[in-house]
């Protein structure tokens, strides 16, 4: 079985991989990092006009990092909007994924948080800097191979 976006991508010979459907019937697609920006633009034009959420996670110690996008197709008069989940995987050594800030502005803080916690660089993001951790923090706290420092001095806020 294929979702509507997946069927459309197949019809137009755009490379992706279906990872199946979740318990709510939402299809999850895997997109290569180098194809992500063009498929994001296509998804927006296709009608996925709302980025419900973006998050990231460490797949396994020493393994890939994943950036996950939950897109919704909001249309006037439709009670059950169409949704899709897209996963973009990046290599741990130099994790780079194109930013979708210029398509969905709501990705701004979410991509910054993923950068701050996991070290995924979102190319062409206008303000990619730490958002939760101090600028002086070393490392990426949500990576499975992260070693927490024994001591960290927090500066006063004057």
UniProtKB/Swiss-Prot annotation:
NDH shuttles electrons from NAD(P)H:plastoquinone, via FMN and iron-sulfur (Fe-S) centers, to quinones in the photosynthetic chain and possibly in a chloroplast respiratory chain. The immediate electron acceptor for the enzyme in this species is believed to be plastoquinone. Couples the redox reaction to proton translocation, and thus conserves the redox energy in a proton gradient. Its EC number is 7.1.1.-. Belongs to the complex I 30 kDa subunit family. It is an enzyme of class 7 (translocase). PROSITE patterns: COMPLEX1_30K (PS00542). InterPro entries: NADH_DH_suC, NADH_quin_OxRdtase_su_C/D-like, NADH_UbQ_OxRdtase_30kDa_su, NADH_UbQ_OxRdtase_CS. This is NAD(P)H-quinone oxidoreductase subunit J, chloroplastic. One of its GO terms (cellular component) is chloroplast thylakoid membrane. It comes from the Eukaryota. Keywords: Chloroplast, Membrane, NAD, NADP, Plastid, Plastoquinone, Quinone, Thylakoid, Translocase, Transport. GO terms for biological process: photosynthesis, light reaction. NDH is composed of at least 16 different subunits, 5 of which are encoded in the nucleus. It catalyses: a plastoquinone + NADH + (n+1) H(+)(in) = a plastoquinol + NAD(+) + n H(+)(out); a plastoquinone + NADPH + (n+1) H(+)(in) = a plastoquinol + NADP(+) + n H(+)(out). It is found in: Plastid, Chloroplast thylakoid membrane. The keyword Ligase does not apply. The gene is ndhJ. Pfam families: Complex1_30kDa (PF00329). GO terms for molecular function: NADH dehydrogenase (ubiquinone) activity; quinone binding. It is a peripheral membrane protein. HAMAP family: NDH1_NuoC. The keyword Membrane applies.
